[in-house]
């Protein structure tokens, strides 16, 4: 009798582990495809606008107008409380909600900034883009808050990997940036 209980327990554990493995395999594949595709498009557009600006140096004269355009976009999207990458990290630590409208806003505003010669890095944009899309995928799949946080990290890794072409470094970077300031 005890052997049968032990056998049931063993098979239940195997089933649960296989279910978790399959669930995260599908979710990470979806996040990788969607976020990776969007981030690859972002990287191509970024290269295009940077090359265009390099060959048309007069574009920098319109940088103040580009800044006004970006402020106008933030106003249209009704996005007043932009904390940048910190918002993505706060979502992972369960402090704030991550809006999906952050993704197109970051995509467009970073391209405008680069087109007119502004100073903006790709790292923050990658993390915000990937985190925002990953969080939205988690909502669409109706995941728990804890699972959505993991999907946000998957999205951050996928975006970072697609933009910089470094998949292993992207995973390590996402785990590292989430653990900053946490002592074990």
Kindly label every feature range from the protein language model:
Residues 1-184:
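Alpha-helical transmembrane segments and immediately membrane-proximal extracytoplasmic
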């Amino acid at each position: 009798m005890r052997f049968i209980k032990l056998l049931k327990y063993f098979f239940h554990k195997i089933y649960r582990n296989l279910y978790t493995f399959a669930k995260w395999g599908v979710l990470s594949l979806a996040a990788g495809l969607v976020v990776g595709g969007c981030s690859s498009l972002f990287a191509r557009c970024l290269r295009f606008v940077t090359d265009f600006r390099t060959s048309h140096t007069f574009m920098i004269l319109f940088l103040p107008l580009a800044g006004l355009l970006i402020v106008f976009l933030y106003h249209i999207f009704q996005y007043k409380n932009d904390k940048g990458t910190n918002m993505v990290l706060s979502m992972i630590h369960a402090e704030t909600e991550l809006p999906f409208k952050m993704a197109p806003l970051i995509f467009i505003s970073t391209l405008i900034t680069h087109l007119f010669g502004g100073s903006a890095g790709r790292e923050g944009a990658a993390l915000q883009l990937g985190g925002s899309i990953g969080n939205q995928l988690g909502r669409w799949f109706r995941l728990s808050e804890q699972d959505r946080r993991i999907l946000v990290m998957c999205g951050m890794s996928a975006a970072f990997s697609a933009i910089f072409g470094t998949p292993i470094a992207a995973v390590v970077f996402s785990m590292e940036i989430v653990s900053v300031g946490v002592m074990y």
